[in-house]
Design a protein with these regions (language model features):
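Nucleotide and nucleotide-moiety/phosphate-recognizing core
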Residues: 2-193, 200-207
Length: 208
């Protein structure tokens, strides 16, 4: 197994959801500071990886107009982000796949580097980002952000089997594997790094 570097990582933007809490719009095409969310995500990935591709299930020609390869889920029925990740592994040209959702406009510009450091240090085939959150007691604790993950291609069979058996929860699948943890809680890490927009109000709040 070759350690991840920018040359052997494919960036994968997950934009295939139904956005039910936003009235069913195609979330990746919604504007954030004048730019489509999925396009913003792709551009943030572009400097970190070898190539960027998109996962979308609607308006494919709109996504393709940006110049990136676009792939709909290989499983039917909107099976969730894991289905998008599986599609990424099935269409990955490199040894590693870096997944990000389209609706977190401030994810770190060193995401690939730091997750790569984590898998290299622990010799694992998966790394997951962790970020500070305030819990019900008012304490700040780091929690996993599993949609932000670095996956080795060898995970394709495991993920396919999990989905075929009816599994849909990301945490349940990642728990099947020893995965490296990378905390994004350094002084320069913004508290909004992994904030996502599930509603119009949240999207407006992120715009400031």
């Amino acid at each position: 197994m070759v350690a991840p570097t920018p040359d052997n990582i494919t960036g994968w933007v997950l934009a295939g959801g139904q956005a039910q809490r936003m009235g069913g719009v195609d979330k990746g095409l919604q504007l954030f500071q004048g730019q489509a969310l999925a396009l913003r995500a792709a551009k943030r990935l572009q400097t970190q990886v070898h190539i960027v591709k998109l996962n979308a299930n609607r308006h494919l020609s709109d996504y393709a107009s940006w110049g990136y390869d676009v792939h709909p889920d290989s499983l039917s029925g909107y099976a969730g982000p894991l289905a998008g990740m599986l599609t990424g592994l099935q269409n990955c040209d490199t040894e590693w796949l870096l997944c990000v959702p389209c609706d977190s406009p401030f994810f770190p510009l060193d995401l690939a580097y730091r997750l790569g450091m984590a898998v290299d240090a622990e010799q694992s085939i998966m790394a997951v980002a962790w970020a500070p959150e305030v819990n019900a007691q008012g304490d700040t604790v780091c929690r996993p952000q599993p949609v932000f993950c670095l996956l080795h291609l060898s995970l394709q069979t495991s993920l396919s089997d999990f989905l075929q058996s009816g599994g849909r929860k990301i945490d349940a699948w990642t728990a099947q594997h020893a995965n490296a943890r990378m905390d994004f809680n350094l002084p320069h890490d913004t508290h909004q790094a992994f904030a996502n927009a599930n509603t119009w109000q949240e999207l407006k709040g992120l715009e400031g």
